[in-house]
């Protein structure tokens, strides 16, 4: 029972229900938004544990696996793991898979979501013990009457994110600091403890001043009032436990999520890894920053050392454009070879006239993509099938057909284009779409 029935519990405006397996034959043109984007995972068990807006639908990953006629003899790679959508879908199909993720927080998400959990009663007991301990700790926190005093006394426990007061109101931040301290002192089986951390990280944005009103998080004009964070967390833990029970009879193939850079796959994956299918969605060339989007999570449990490390993470990532990466772009970036130069030349002239920074961004993106494609070629079997979900871009009203350019880069490494299906129109600008690029070795 909650201590105060009148206090608000922060929740996402999402219908909570168990998902179903996908029953229709896959089609890839004129798909609904739910069948392409993150919206497709909001009601599916385990997939819904953390919302990342620029992630794609489990239904799409499942449809691609069906289109490829993958069996349990196949081995699937997602080199841009994100929140683990592809490896989790493959797990539920009984197909072994691996994925690679450069962001340490997102690597954690994918790892926790794709693990096997069998001791569900013990997990439930851990959840109950943790909530009880957290509620007990809150009795000593004046988060309604004097949150500022508590925060000053425990300043060393506030996440090291820049301007934390922008992210959380004082009463909510005081509760989160107490929650963070409780997690650090709680003793449990490590994998069960990771589930608790996952639940905590999953509520950071719902109890914050940030909103999912756009592709990137934005701050609300009016800060969120003090809410019942213990109640919000208890709901999240209960939802996660229901999800684990819902998938408890699903197959349990080998799934591995590796921390590393997809531009260096052969250094990240075990030796002799041979992939029969790649299903993935790389960052779109649209200046979206995954490092910026996940800052609260990166800092809350110290997945990253500090602001400079976030800047380096952004610089190393394909499509990095925020923070330190902007300084790199401002110095100018040249095509790394004749292939990239020739592919981009028809598009860069108009963009260069309007802004050198954006031209450098595009060049860096496709330089990075070239390095990535060269590594994919080294780990794929003969006859491997590839599906890359990507959106096109517009820079100063100049279109950039990212799907076609990607196919050309992979063609250089021996991957034949089968077809490009443009799945849906995007709503942010006229002329934008999302496509899936099918290729075969």
PLM feature segments, named:
Residues 1-72:
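S-adenosyl-L-methionine
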Residues 48-52, 159-167, 294, 356-367, ...:
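Acceptor-substrate binding/catalytic loop of class I
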Residues 57, 64-138, 232-267, 271-320, ...:
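Conserved S-adenosyl-L-methionine
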Residues 75, 195, 384-385:
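Short glycine-centered segments of the SAM/dcSAM-binding site in methyltransferase folds
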Residues 96-99, 103-249, 291-355:
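Class I S-adenosyl-L-methionine-dependent methyltransferase module
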Residues 199, 203, 394-396, 426:
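C-terminal target-recognition/interaction regions appended to catalytic cores
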Residues 367-382, 410:
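A short glycine-rich, Lys/Arg-flanked "PGG" loop and its adjoining helix->strand segment in the class I
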Residues 381, 429-441:
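Core SAM-dependent methyltransferase catalytic element
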């Amino acid at each position: 029972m909650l201590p105060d029935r009148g206090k608000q519990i922060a929740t996402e405006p999402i219908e909570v229900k168990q998902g179903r397996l996908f029953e229709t034959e896959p089609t890839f043109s004129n798909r609904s938004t739910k069948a392409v984007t993150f919206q497709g995972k909001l009601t599916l068990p385990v997939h819904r544990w953390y919302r990342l807006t620029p992630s794609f639908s489990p239904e799409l990953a499942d449809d691609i696996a069906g289109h490829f006629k993958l069996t349990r003899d196949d081995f699937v790679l997602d080199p841009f793991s994100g929140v683990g959508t592809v490896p989790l879908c493959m797990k539920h199909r009984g197909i072994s898979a691996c994925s690679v993720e450069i962001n340490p927080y997102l690597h954690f998400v994918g790892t926790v979501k794709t693990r096997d959990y069998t001791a569900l009663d013990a997990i439930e007991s851990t959840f109950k013990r943790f909530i009880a301990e957290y509620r007990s700790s809150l009795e000593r926190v004046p988060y309604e009457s004097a949150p500022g005093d508590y925060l000053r006394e425990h300043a060393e426990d506030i996440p090291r994110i820049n301007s934390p007061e922008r992210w959380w109101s004082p009463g909510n931040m005081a509760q989160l600091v107490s929650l963070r301290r409780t997690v650090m002192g709680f003793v449990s089986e490590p994998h069960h403890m990771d589930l608790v951390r996952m639940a905590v990280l999953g509520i950071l944005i719902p109890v914050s001043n940030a909103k999912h009103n756009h592709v990137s998080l934005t701050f609300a004009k009016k800060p969120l009032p003090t809410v019942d964070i213990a109640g919000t967390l208890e709901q999240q833990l209960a939802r996660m436990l229901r999800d684990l029970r819902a998938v408890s009879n699903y197959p349990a193939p080998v799934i591995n999520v590796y921390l590393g850079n997809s531009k260096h796959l052969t250094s990240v994956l075990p030796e002799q890894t041979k992939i029969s299918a790649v299903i993935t969605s790389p960052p779109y060339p649209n200046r979206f920053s995954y490092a910026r989007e996940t800052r609260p999570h990166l800092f809350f449990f110290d997945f990253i050392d500090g602001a400079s490390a976030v800047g380096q993470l952004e610089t190393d990532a394909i499509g990095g454009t925020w923070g330190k990466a902007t300084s790199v772009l401002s110095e100018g970036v040249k095509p790394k070879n004749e292939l990239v130069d020739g592919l981009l030349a028809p598009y860069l002239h108009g963009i260069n006239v309007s802004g050198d920074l954006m031209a450098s961004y595009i060049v860096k993106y496709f330089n990075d993509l070239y390095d990535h494609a060269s590594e994919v070629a080294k780990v794929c079997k003969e006859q491997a099938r590839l599906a890359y979900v990507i959106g096109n871009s517009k820079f100063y009203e100049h279109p950039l057909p990212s799907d076609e350019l990607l196919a050309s880069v992979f063609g250089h490494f021996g991957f034949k284009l089968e077809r490009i299906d443009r799945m849906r129109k995007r709503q942010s600008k006229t002329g934008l779409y999302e496509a899936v690029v099918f290729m075969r070795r």
